Amino acid sequence: ESVWKALCILKERGQSGFVMIHDGARPFITDEILKRVYEQVQVQKACVVGMPVKDTIKLINKEKQIKESPDRSLVWQAQTPQAFELSLIVEAFERQLKEDCSHITDDAMVVEKQMGVPVYMVEGSYNNIKITTPEDLVIARAFLNV
């Protein structure tokens, strides 16, 4: 909802170009990551920071039965920032808001689902963690003490 409000303000003010959307819960963003995202979004129109997963991933059903083990080399964990051509993300949100949004977990999903435009991964950092649990806070403190 906060992203949509910000996008509406940009649209009302006649802004164009690109927008980066970043979680406030990811304090370890670097200039290098921002530069890579900026360069990529100008070429591809939609990109997400992320990193390859280290663990094997299992897709399960509601009964927790394993249904699939995807090829780990093709699975990345998404981070932020996520960057988009402004008109693209605004139109994607306008379309998505007419539907159920409860399953949407990041802004790239809206573009993927609504626009059919490829979204590209940009290498981030394993240090670009999202601090949401007490365990995350322990890791963040360790990063700060290094």
List the predicted regions and their residue ranges.
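Conserved beta-loop-beta/alpha segment of the NTase-like Rossmann-fold superfamily
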Residues: E1-K62, Q79
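Short, flexible, basic/aromatic active-site loop/helix in glycosyltransferases
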Residues: L59-F84
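Structural motif
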Residues: G17-M20, K45-V48, T56, Q65-K67, ...
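Short, hinge-like loop/turn segments at secondary-structure boundaries
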Residues: Y38-E39, E63-S69, V138-I139
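Conserved alpha/beta core of the MobA/IspD/sugar-nucleotide pyrophosphorylase nucleotidyltransferase superfamily
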Residues: W76-V146
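A residue-level structural signature of the nucleotidyltransferase/glycosyltransferase Rossmann-like core
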Residues: R26, A46-V48, K67, P81, ...
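Short, glycine- and charge-enriched coil/turn segments that flank and shape catalytic ligand pockets
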Residues: K11-G17, V43, N61-K67, R95-S102, ...
